[in-house]
Amino acid sequence: MKTQRTRSQERILNVLKSLNRSISAQDLYIELRSREMSMGLATVYRALEALKLDGMVQVRTLANGESLY
């Protein structure tokens, strides 16, 4: 069964597709704000986690513990 994506998840997916590069959740938050699609940082993290669990995004964890999506 396909899960329904939230508006926040859709916005994040669109930004990730347009960037064509890996980005941290913090940088994604800043990018969303610059595109006037502001949402809370906690919302960004929750949406990324849900997208990861659905297999829509891949995560890579760097040696310093930072995750890139």
Residue ranges and their predicted role:
Residues 18-27:
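Short capping segments at the starts of secondary-structure elements
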Residues 61-67:
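Short, Lys/Arg-rich nucleic-acid/phosphate-binding segment
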Residues 55:
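Glycine-centered, phosphate/nucleic-acid-interacting loop/turn motifs that mediate DNA/RNA or nucleotide
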Residues 27-33:
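A short acidic, leucine-rich amphipathic alpha-helix
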Residues 1-14:
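Short alpha-helical segments that sit at the start of domains
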